[in-house]
Every structure is written in C-alpha cells, then in structure tokens.
Curated annotation (Swiss-Prot):
Residues where Phosphoserine is found: S59
GO MF, any single term: DNA binding
Entry keyword set: Acetylation, DNA-binding, Nucleus, Phosphoprotein, Transcription, Transcription regulation
GO cellular component terms attached to this protein's record: transcription factor TFIIE complex
Positions of post-translational N-acetylmethionine modification: M1
Domain of life assignment: Eukaryota
UniProt similarity note: Belongs to the TFIIE beta subunit family.
Gene designation: GTF2E2
Record-linked InterPro entries: TFA2_Winged_2, TFIIE-bsu, TFIIE_bsu_DNA-bd, WH-like_DNA-bd_sf, WH_DNA-bd_sf
Annotated DNA-binding residue span(s): 64-144
Assembly notes: Tetramer of two alpha and two beta chains. Interacts with FACT subunit SUPT16H. Interacts with ATF7IP. Interacts with SND1. Part of TBP-based Pol II pre-initiation complex (PIC), in which Pol II core assembles with general transcription factors and other specific initiation factors including GTF2E1, GTF2E2, GTF2F1, GTF2F2, TCEA1, ERCC2, ERCC3, GTF2H2, GTF2H3, GTF2H4, GTF2H5, GTF2A1, GTF2A2, GTF2B and TBP; this large multi-subunit PIC complex mediates DNA unwinding and targets Pol II core to the transcription start site where the first phosphodiester bond forms.
Protein name stated in the entry: General transcription factor IIE subunit 2
Length: 289
C-alpha cells in the first residue's frame, strides 16, 4: 500500500479519537424520566387544587393567623377606625372592651390578644382614651358643635397660630360637614399645595381694600430661598427693625456682688519682749559726716 495513504489513515484515526461522541438515550430511560415528570405535575396540581378549594371555601382568613403579630395589629387598626367613625356619627360615649369586640365582630379572639389590647394596645394608643375602665375615641380637637369650632378658629387667629386642617376638624367634630356648611362666610378655606384644605377664621373687622399695585409688588417678592436670619439682615440694612426689637424686653435679674472677705490682721511674733523698755529706735537720726 502507498505510504501516503497509510499516513492519512493514521491521521484520520487520531482525529476520530479526539472528537467527542454523542450517544442516543435508551428508550427505557426516557420513559422513566417522563413518568417522574408526570408524577410531579400531578402532585403539584393536587396540592394547588387543595389550596384553591380552601380559598373557595373561605377557610383561609385572618383567623388562621391568630397567633401572629399581623393579626393583632389588624384587629387594633379595625377597632381604632370603628371608634373614629362612631365618634364622627355623634356616638361619643365610651364602651367596654367586650362591647367593642362585639360591634367589630371580634369576640372569638384569644385571651392573649384580649390581654394585649387591655394592658398595652388600647391604653398606649394616642387616639384612644380610657374613661372609668371604658374606651373612647380621642381626637386632636374635641368639638361638640359649630360654636365650639368657631371659637377654636377665633383663638387660633388671635394667637397667630394660623388655620386648622379640615381633616382634623372632621375627626373631632360630629357631623362636621353640616357644621362647616352652616358657618358660611364666617370661615375661609385655603387649599395647600398637597391638596389638603385648611380652615381660617374670617375676621370681618380686618377686611379692607388694598391697592392692586401694592398687591403685585407684594406677590413679586420671593423669599423661598431665604431663611429668617437672611431676612432679618436685609431688613436691618434697609433701616427696618423687626417686631421683637420693639416688644417688651425681659429685665435681667440683678446679680449681687459678693463682698470680699475681711482680711484678718496678721500678728507677728515679737522677740526680746523683756528688753522693751531698754531698747531705743535711732532710725530718725541722720548719720554724721
């Protein structure tokens, strides 16, 4: 045989040995793997169907989480919201814990949750106050009627405290919408940039006409980027003193000076006391030349 053909044959064998071979799976292994996959799918489907049936039957609810902290705080939030709504309806009398749980449909909670509500949750909640062992809603402003609302707005205006949020009034005044509508032009509404409404007392004694040119000048001045110190410095440069300089000044208490302690005369020990009548002092006589 030609030696060149033999060399080519040897090279072909080496290349064949170096290249990886891909073998086909046997039919039995493929069948077993497909059976395993089907079994897993059937098991997952059965568990999912069980969960779906539980949801459809209504067995999965908050009561299943009765031992968790989320359930406790959910009950607390529901109680506070209920006490708020009944206060806004005009039912301001306090209730016992059993009455609250009955009206909120939570009589089936455990003893630990009841103890937690009585000893910690309701007592320390800023929106709940305890009155003779009973619980009532505690609004920011406890208002009885429209007259109380008008007095509160007038007090805020006189003290320079500004207005009051409408949501705070709705929280503390029963049937607040009727009361606000009945006051009419005695109050003013101002909308904040965050779309919250603020109520102000409409002091009719302060109503006067202002020149339009002055209004334009007033609105053209922007002080958003300036703080109180910068505004005060600018006013001082213009020769304008702030209101706090013209107000009553506090009198500083007079500090009494402490008297210096009297110095005791120092006593010197004298020597040669037995020669007091014999010795003479010659310091006044000038020395002779």
């Amino acid at each position: 045989m030609d030696p060149s053909l033999l060399r080519e044959r040897e090279l072909f064998k080496k290349r064949a040995l170096s290249t990886p071979a891909v073998e086909k799976r046997s039919v039995s292994s493929e069948a077993s793997s497909s059976k395993k996959k089907k079994a897993k799918l059937e098991h997952g489907g059965s568990s999912g169907s069980k969960q779906n049936s539980d949801h459809s039957n209504g067995s999965f609810n908050l009561k299943a989480l009765s031992g968790s902290s989320g359930y406790k705080f959910g009950v607390l939030a529901k109680i506070v919201n209920y006490m708020k709504t009944r206060h806004q309806r005009g039912d301001t009398h306090p209730l016992t814990l059993e009455e609250i749980l009955d009206e909120t449909q939570h009589l089936d909670i455990g003893l630990k949750q009841k103890q937690w509500l009585m000893s910690e949750a309701l007592v320390n909640n800023p929106k709940i106050e305890v009155v003779d062992g009973k619980y009532a809603f505690k609004p920011k402003y406890n208002l009885k009627d429209k007259k109380a609302l008008l007095r509160l707005l007038d007090q805020h205006d006189q003290r320079g405290l500004g207005g009051i949020l409408l949501e705070d009034i709705e929280e503390g005044l029963p049937n607040s919408q009727k009361a606000v509508k009945a006051l009419g032009d005695q109050i003013l509404f101002v909308n904040r940039p965050d779309k919250k409404k603020i109520l102000f007392f409409n002091d009719k004694s302060c109503q006067f006409s202002v020149d339009e040119e002055f209004q334009k000048l007033w609105r053209s001045v922007t002080v958003d980027s300036m703080d109180e110190e910068k505004i005060e410095e600018y006013l001082k440069r213009q020769g304008i003193s702030s209101m706090q300089d013209s107000g009553p000044k506090k009198v500083a208490p007079i500090q009494r000076r402490k008297k210096p302690a009297s110095q005791k005369k120092r006593r010197f020990k004298t020597h040669n006391e037995h020669l007091a009548g014999v010795l003479k002092d010659y310091s006044d006589i000038a020395p002779g030349k």
